[in-house]
Curated annotation (Swiss-Prot):
Keywords: Activator, Transcription, Transcription regulation. PANTHER family: POU DOMAIN CLASS 2-ASSOCIATING FACTOR 2 (PTHR28376:SF1), RGD1562914 (PTHR28376). Belongs to the POU2AF family. The keyword Chloroplast does not apply. Residues 200-211 have a biased composition (Low complexity). One of its GO terms (cellular component) is nucleus. It comes from Danio rerio. Disulfide bonds: none annotated. Residues 176-219 are annotated as: Disordered. Transcriptional coactivator that may regulate cell type-specific differentiation pathways. It comes from the Eukaryota. Pfam families: POU2AF2. This is POU class 2 homeobox associating-factor 2. PROSITE patterns: OCA.
Length: 291
């Protein structure tokens, strides 16, 4: 008994039945009972190595036979080639032509409609019942003679020559009139009530008096005059926004007796900056700062 168990050592453990024994018993059961009960002839067993088959090493060094294609596909059961063809051939694929779709669709598949599609009559050869032949030409514009060439060759931004001439006559006096006719260059003391009003009495200008109800002023001009602005401040520098006439003639304003007695120092009086006798306002500021 010890000799039998000594042979059955599986990974250091004595076992009664090893995996090899179980596989051998299973293989014997498969060979004894037929695999396919319907097969009439006894073929070679599936796991028995045949002399012509290639033997591969299997699980736990057990030899297994490489099954060939002839062994897997048993020749006992033959599939006849006419099994499916006879079944399909008994009933042909046919359909009822009249009941599938209406008969008026056939008019679209006539050979006449597949002619030259660029021709003028290709749209009206076979319209069918859905689109009568008279409805298609009405959708297209009628181009004939000079009207067609005028519509095709003329750009959308083109304008007649007389319109462009009128526009230049209208736009040019608006830009040139404030420079030539504005009396602001003569000085602020010209005496005119509204020196910035655009005068439209130029020769060659076609602007009516009613087309410009408002007064046009240049961007750099201001509505008030220069003397009223400079009298409010004691600075002799010209304002930032002034008329060209004000820039040409700059008047130096003198310091009045009231401003001199009040201690207001004007920027135009350059002699006041040179005098520093220690009795000015700067000394009093320094003494106040010490506290």
């Amino acid at each position: 008994m010890e000799t039998e168990y000594s042979k059955r050592v599986y990974q250091g453990v004595r076992v009664k039945h090893t995996v090899k024994d179980l596989l051998a018993e299973k293989r014997l059961r498969q060979t004894n009972t037929p695999r396919f009960s319907t097969s009439s002839s006894s073929s070679q067993p599936a796991f028995v190595p045949m002399p012509g088959s290639h033997v591969l090493p299997g699980y736990y060094s057990m030899r297994r036979s490489f099954l060939q294609d002839s062994e897997l596909c048993h020749t006992v059961k033959q599939y006849s080639s006419d099994t499916y063809s006879s079944a399909l051939g008994s009933k042909a694929f046919s359909y009822d032509h009249a009941s599938t779709y209406p008969a008026f669709i056939d008019s679209y598949y006539t050979p006449d409609s597949y002619g030259d599609y660029r021709g003028p009559t290709s749209y009206t050869t076979s319209g069918g019942s859905l689109f009568p032949p008279s409805s298609l030409p009405t959708l297209l514009p009628t181009l004939s003679g000079e009207s067609s060439s005028h519509l095709l060759l003329r750009d959308p931004w083109d304008q007649p020559s007389e319109d462009s001439v009128n526009q230049t006559e209208v736009l040019c006096p608006e830009a040139a009139a404030p420079v030539a006719d504005s009396p602001s260059l003569a000085g602020p003391d010209s005496g005119s009530s509204s020196p910035y009003r655009l005068t439209s009495g130029r020769s060659g200008s076609s602007i009516p008096s009613s087309s410009q109800p408002y007064t046009l002023q240049p961007l750099e001009d201001v509505p008030y005059t220069a003397p009223s602005y400079t009298s409010a401040s004691s600075y002799s520098c010209p304002p930032y926004m002034s008329t060209p006439g004000d820039l040409a003639v700059v008047k130096m304003t003198a310091v009045t007796s009231e401003e001199a007695s009040g201690g207001v120092v004007s920027l135009s009086d350059t002699t006041s900056w040179a005098k520093d006798d220690g009795t000015g306002s700067w000394l009093s500021y320094e003494t106040r700062r010490a506290f």
